[in-house]
Design a protein with these regions (language model features):
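A short, hydrophobic beta-strand-centered structural micro-motif
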Residues: 316-335
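TRNA-recognition modules of translation machinery and tRNA-sensing kinases, especially anticodon-binding
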Residues: 2-310, 333-468
Length: 468
């Protein structure tokens, strides 16, 4: 897999396992030549965002004491059948496990902070590798079993956590939208009367893929005080309430899918593109000039790379396009006067001079970024169809990806939505692309089950195979 290179050939993707039957894209961080750089740029965007909200990054170990997982299993929810145990040559050593989530581990850390006299609220993030053994079937998130990147945030506080919930759910949707990844924020429905063993409420950011299925990008769990009570996270005798946020490589992989709507020419948003400007010499003799231009762009903070493959112009253009660069700078040969063309593909665009390359590239990248975001949001909205009632099997061919159906909060109506088996229940939509819906402004429509007027709705669609 790590030797595979995207060449615009969908069959090659299948053979290299970058695309698989289990999930649209897998193994992106090991995909040559730039998968790791793409993942890192996405992580940096979320790191900066959480830092702006007062979150501090911790370097948590990937190994956690097995005792912490056992305490969680005894009073909250057990993951003991899904963890990897790490063995030591010393039989007397404390048994440890590979971390699968942050909650038990960070609860112990926060309890220690409180004993040392630190005061809440606590807001932290961490990025690391996690692992999980899914013995009952491979879940899309865990195709590699050991997952990197895994980004988590945890907030612990006394009192109302609605502002932190909105920050984790809706504001992060704005981060995703700004890199060309459209989202809908939803709250997961659960069977009326069912107690949440792990969390009081679960929120998600989902995206509707171009092929017509939905996939979950981020999750926000309202954990209540269950972890604080189990691990002794108390301030002045009061257990702290907790929120957990997380996303994995799945978010990056969904970003790849949206970027590859044209498999011959993927395009990444300038903010996260490993190569913002691909510099392509039309003839091999222009490689030196191309290198000087790329260096000038780099000096102005624009990520540029020269594609000077000696096998010929076609090889150069194919490799340049494979990097998903949003902008191309073509260095024409002597027969065309050595002109420079700046455009959205090789050999296209307006003629510019060497002295204006950096300024014009910066202007074009800003415009292209706005255009990509707008197109992604518009296309995403077209995948949602509004309906008055639950769909019938005969309606499926007319549903682009999902349907939004009015649904009130009555227990019988929630059960009716969960019981229908035509489409998967994605959740109750609460916002999109970083903006929360104004519940009071939503027009009342007859509930699909009881017909009472309601401003609430439910999103139904086809979840990607294996997703719960």
């Amino acid at each position: 897999m790590t030797a595979a290179t995207w060449t615009g050939d969908a069959a090659a993707l299948q053979r290299s396992y970058i695309v698989s039957a289990k999930y649209p894209v897998s193994g992106a961080s090991g995909w040559l030549p730039h998968g790791y750089a793409l993942c890192s740029n996405v992580l940096d965007a979320f790191r900066a965002f959480f830092a702006s909200g007062g979150y501090e990054e911790l370097g948590l170990a990937s190994a956690v004491p097995l005792d912490a997982m056992e305490r969680q299993a005894g009073s909250i929810k057990s993951f003991l059948d899904r963890i990897y145990l790490l063995r030591s040559g010393d039989e007397q050593a404390e048994p440890v496990a590979l971390a699968s989530t942050i909650e038990a581990q960070i609860s112990g850390v926060m309890a220690a902070w409180l004993r040392e006299g630190h005061r809440p609220p606590f807001r932290v993030t961490t990025v690391r590798t996690v692992g999980r053994h899914e013995g009952h079937g491979t879940r899309p998130l865990w195709m590699e079993r050991f997952v990197w990147p895994f980004f988590e945030a945890q907030a612990a506080f006394v009192g109302d956590g609605s502002a932190d919930t909105s920050f984790m759910l809706h504001a992060t949707g704005g981060v995703a939208a700004a890199m060309g990844l459209p989202t809908v924020a939803v709250e997961r429905l659960k069977e009326p009367g069912a107690a949440g063993a792990y969390a009081d409420r679960r929120h998600e950011l989902v995206t509707l893929l171009p092929e017509g299925t939905s996939t979950t990008l981020t999750s926000v769990y309202e954990l209540g005080t269950r972890f604080s009570e189990t691990f002794g996270v108390h301030s002045d005798g009061v257990p702290l309430s907790m929120l957990n946020f997380g996303f994995s490589a799945r978010l990056v992989l969904a970003l790849l899918v949206h970027a590859h709507t044209d498999p011959d020419k993927p395009v990444y948003h300038p903010s996260i593109a490993p190569v913002q400007v691909a510099v392509v010499p039309a003839v091999a003799e222009g490689a030196g000039r191309a290198a000087a231009l790329a260096a000038a762009l780099d000096a102005h903070g624009i990520r540029a790379e020269v594609f000077g493959d000696q096998r010929g112009y076609r090889a150069r253009t194919t490799r340049a396009r494979a990097h998903g660069a949003p902008l191309f700078l073509t260095v024409e040969g002597p027969e065309r006067g050595g002109v420079l063309l700046l455009g959205e593909d090789v050999g296209e665009g307006r003629t510019i001079t060497e002295t204006e390359v950096a300024a014009r590239a910066a202007e074009r990248l800003a415009v292209l970024g706005e255009t990509l975001c707008r197109r992604a949001v518009d296309a995403h909205r077209e995948r949602i169809l509004d309906r008055a009632g639950f769909p019938e099997p005969g309606d499926l061919a007319r549903i682009p990806a999902a349907v939004r159906v009015p649904l009130c909060t009555a227990a019988a109506c929630v059960s009716a939505a969960l019981d229908q088996d035509v489409l998967d229940v994605i959740g109750r939509p609460t916002g999109e692309n970083g903006a929360a819906y104004d519940a009071g402004a939503a027009p009342d429509r007859p509930c699909a089950h009881c017909a009472r007027p309601t401003g609430s709705s439910v999103l139904l669609g086809r979840k990607f195979r294996g997703e719960k």
